[in-house]
A protein has these predicted regions:
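Nucleotidyl polymerases of mobile genetic elements and RNA viruses
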Residues: 1-222
Length: 222
């Protein structure tokens, strides 16, 4: 099934697919998602506050407000800062399956568990109903199903790839982030599922580093 995001029906990119999963698959998918919930707080970086138990998304919102307030009122020193807001368009539809598999391997999941998850997301197919009759058999090669209980969890795991790239750049002093005082930790980015807020020094070098990070993540994730 498809729904429209707006009243403008002329553009195809505004059409969202809604998958109709059978009951047995939804039970399996929900069970796997519940098993994930117990370990997500231990494997997902703390800058991701959405869809994680014992974390509130309002915490990241308050941190963003405080940092932007600091930037707007900063009048000491020569360094300026920049804030970039990223919105991943059709994020669920474009993720490469091999990428989620590699990320789960890096996070230490067993091969048996990874194979179970991959079977859930790869053994699917679609049909097109024309004049009331189902036609064709479309087999996707990327993306997560909209409405699948497992999809949000898998997307959080995929975003860890982006966080890992940013933290590696921060360790190499290529992407320094922002700190409001000497005793505070430096903040490089905050995540709200597929919406990201990045903080970095207003310099050509760090802007190039950010572009490099996003290009590498795009190439890997699709």
């Amino acid at each position: 099934m498809y729904i429209y995001e707006s009243l403008d029906f002329k553009t195809c990119h505004l059409i969202r697919p809604i998958n109709l999963c059978n009951v047995v698959y939804k039970l399996i998918s929900k069970t796997i998602a519940n098993r994930f919930k117990a370990i997500l707080p231990h494997i997902i970086f703390e800058n991701q506050s959405a869809l994680i138990s014992d974390r509130l998304i309002i915490d990241n919102v308050l941190v963003v407000f405080e940092l932007i307030h600091y930037i707007n009122h900063k009048n000491v020193g020569v360094d300026g800062y920049m804030v970039a807001k990223l919105d991943m368009s059709k994020a669920f539809d474009r993720v490469e399956w091999c990428f989620i598999k590699r990320v789960m391997e890096k996070l230490g999941f067993s091969s048996k568990w990874i194979n179970l998850v991959m079977r859930c997301i790869s053994l699917i197919s679609y049909s097109v109903i024309i004049n009331g009759a189902a036609c064709g058999n479309i087999i996707p090669t990327r993306g997560f199903q909209q409405g699948d209980p497992l999809s949000p969890t898998l997307f959080l795991i995929c975003i860890e790839g982006l966080s890992a790239l940013i933290y590696r750049a921060a360790r190499n002093q290529c992407f320094t982030g922002i700190s409001i005082c000497s005793d505070c930790p430096r903040v490089t980015h905050l995540l709200f599922t597929d919406d990201n807020i990045l903080f970095y020094k207003a310099s050509a070098g760090e802007s190039r580093e950010l572009r490099y990070i996003l290009q590498k993540y795009e190439e890997a994730s699709g």
